[in-house]
Amino acid sequence: MSIESEMIHVEVVYALPQEQRVLTLVVNQQATVEEIIRQSGVLEIYPEIDLGKNKVGVFSRLVKLDATVRDKDRIEIYRPLLADPKEIRRKRAEQAKESGAADPVTGGKPSPLRKAD
């Protein structure tokens, strides 16, 4: 097998609210996700990335740092959530009930068919 056939093309992606950085690399097909991320230089560009805390994935599927990838895969580094999505939805529903924008019984949109009490 030639050296060329052992190499694959991959992308390392890190997204911030104001920008998305896509780094394209040619790496050995046996390289792990962690090795590829380190080789990409993204950790130097964004020192806030901590591979011990930030989750990583390939095409939106979580993977471990010791996983290998295939040709043309996209390795994504995920930022931690700032708030719990369930908690945000609960608060939004409470506010809608209080303001009258939600049915006080069901919590959904008020039904025009329901009789007012």
UniProtKB/Swiss-Prot annotation:
**What InterPro entries does the entry give?**
Mopterin_synth/thiamin_S_b, RnfH, RnfH_sf
- Report the domain of life of the source organism: Bacteria
Q: Please list where the region (Disordered) is annotated.
A: 90-117
Pfam families linked: Ub-RnfH
User: What does the sequence similarity comment in the record state about its family?
Assistant: Belongs to the UPF0125 (RnfH) family.
Stored NCBIfam families: PRK01777.1 (NF002490)
Name of the protein in its database record: UPF0125 protein VV0820
